[in-house]
Amino acid sequence: MSVIETSSIETLGIEIPAIPEIDAFLLCVTPQAWVDYALKNLDVVLIDHALCEKKAASTAISLMHRYPQYDELLDKMTALAREELTHFKQVINLLRERGITYQNIAPGRYAGKIFKHLRTSELGHFIDALIIGAIIEARSCERFAALVPGLVTQGEVALAGYYCSLIKAEARHFEGYLYLAELYTDEPIAPRVASLLAIEQQLIQSPDTKFRFHSGVPC
């Protein structure tokens, strides 16, 4: 972040929450090429952001349906689904305010490529799904923070402030998913986390032909 951007953010009273646990968790930061492209294509960013929030709520409900025997999962996923749907409605309102038509757009490769690596055993599949949930929430958190300085520079102060407000929520979801992954297995999850994070890093840093909120380097 440049001195000008830092000064602008402080003057406007916008503070990007520091989430060191996310920085320590992810293996890479968002490439600047993605940030630059996103700032020029905010309509796509917002549409896909809305879709991501809806999908996150759907994933939480799916986990509740598939694993009803886990009380703590039910509690956390109920709260998460409710919050994700609230965020979905907020982004829909932003789209309407901007005159952008909300629509379904084809998903990028990100989630699909990671989920292809789910283990086939029942417990392995379950734990992997929770770990991947944590990874996606962590990346969302990091991307919101990456966008804020450029949004302020472009005069998108309201959107920058909104994205700052989402950072702590996404970090909380990240922590919740990791907590559940550790809770429901007796084996250390660190090796599996490292393996899935390496896949995520490759997707974030490699060229990507379809620009989306979680896509790789635009090409």
Language model regions located:
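Non-heme di-metal
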Residues: 2-219
